[in-house]
Amino acid sequence: MKKQLIIIAILFFITLSTAFAQNAGEFVVPLTDPNKRGKLKAHLNYGSITIKGSPRKDVLVKYKAIAEGEEDDDDRDEEKRLKPLPRINTKTNSGSDGKNAGLKKISGGTMDLEVTENDNSVRVNSDSWSNKLKLEIELPSGFDLNVSTYNDGDLVISNIQGELEINNYNGEINAENISGSVVATTYNGEIKVTFDKVTEATPMSFSTFNGDIDLTFPASLKATFKMKTEQGEILSGFDMAMIKSGPIQKKDTKSGTYKVVIDEWVKGEINGGGPEFSIKNYNGDIIIRKK
């Protein structure tokens, strides 16, 4: 069995190496047991990831290298985000003699994309800082996700039934038709999530520094919200029973130090309350919509 896995891995690597020469392509990753739930862990240092749930029984991965100066189809209004982090320069300086004048760049650097599957756990990873990638992944709807990207790319997810952990740094997070729970964090970009159904008794968390947090929940939602924004408004389509929060008194038993903390969080209950949903923003609004 081990020998068979090694052979499969070698063939898979050869296939990818050949395909990468074209800078774009796709391949199918079979699951160990298509009838069981799966988990996807996907990470890019530089680029965007789109994930779509479907009735399929395997995982389809499409990849494309975004050339320098080429716009990603998922790029948003650049005025809403900070300037992307600088790329690592992999090109040789041609100097002022113009020795490369008239030549076309065919490729530079490596795509560095690794894909593995073990017992329905699929891992898609690229640690490249010099080549921007666009990944499109189609998989069974019943998957748990751990997805992250760092620089100049958005995370777009749809039609998933499971637990989602979504992390970005310089880009947006957009998830729709979600049944389950979500923990979403980005630094420079908005967060927009639409739920068809939420997992009962499961806390959630949403956080960004620069951009709106826009969440849509079913009308039957029962939750306790803990919300905070420094430079924005909090808006709700639900009737929310507000919870008063006064100064919090604390005393360190070891040092004897006594202090009073003013709680700046806004707290409220929907439909009698439930698990805590923490929503933190700095420069943007918090919007809670009723579906």
What are the roles of these predicted feature ranges?
Residues 130, 138-203, 207-210, 216-221, ...:
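Extended beta-solenoid/beta-helix repeat architectures
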Residues 47, 195, 213, 284:
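Extended lipid/amphipathic-ligand handling interfaces
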Residues 21-44, 48-148, 165, 182-183, ...:
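Acidic (Asp/Glu) and glycine-rich low-complexity loops/linkers
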Residues 1-27:
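Bacterial Sec-dependent N-terminal signal peptides
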Residues 49, 191, 234-235, 286-288:
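Short loop/beta submotifs within extracellular cysteine-rich repeat domains
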Residues 215-216, 236-237, 287-291:
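Extended hydrophobic-aromatic, low-complexity segments
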